[in-house]
């Protein structure tokens, strides 16, 4: 992993990640969470956006040089995948959660050929469910998945276990343990809040204050 702490610092700086241990957020899954990560906010800050784009491209160049195609996971993975593809001069496609119900009925948008070596681009990974749905759609079309990259990773065992079972080589620019450690060291949260944040990650589906 590159300088995960610096990436985490940038996310906190633009408030792409919000920590609120005493008034938790509710995720779409229904989980109560003391953290909310919205990397889409980074897109509004050109210098931070450019820095993260560069780090993403460095990781792709160093670890996934064999990639001949980048695939963004809709919707938040699309801008990062497109920017990286532009920088690296690679073709780009994106994957919807499910096929369109009108028009051509595509789930994958863009031009590709079976057998191409594709790298999946996510903005963040939590349980890994949406990531694996995208992988399944790509594999069904005959594409060769060489790995996956993201900006942020919650580090849930369920995701890492499923990626390992599928043989997916995964890299994230930063992660949850790095971010909360930085928040504690800079005084954004106190020791009690840090402990609460650590306990949440152990069992997020049943966590309560």
Question: What is the role of each PLM region?
Answer:
Residues 1-63:
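Active-site-facing substrate-recognition patch
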Residues 2-11, 136-209:
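PRPP-dependent phosphoribosyltransferase catalytic core
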Residues 56-68, 135-141:
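Phosphate/pyrophosphate-binding loops at sites that engage ATP/ADP/AMP, CoA/4′-phosphopantetheine
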Residues 65-74, 149:
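Short glycine-rich phosphate-binding loop at a beta-alpha junction
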Residues 68, 116, 146:
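Conserved acidic residues
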Residues 76-78:
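Conserved coil-to-alpha-helix start sites within the AMP-binding
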Residues 81-119, 127-133:
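Short, glycine/charge-rich flexible loops or terminal/linker lids adjacent to PRPP-binding catalytic cores
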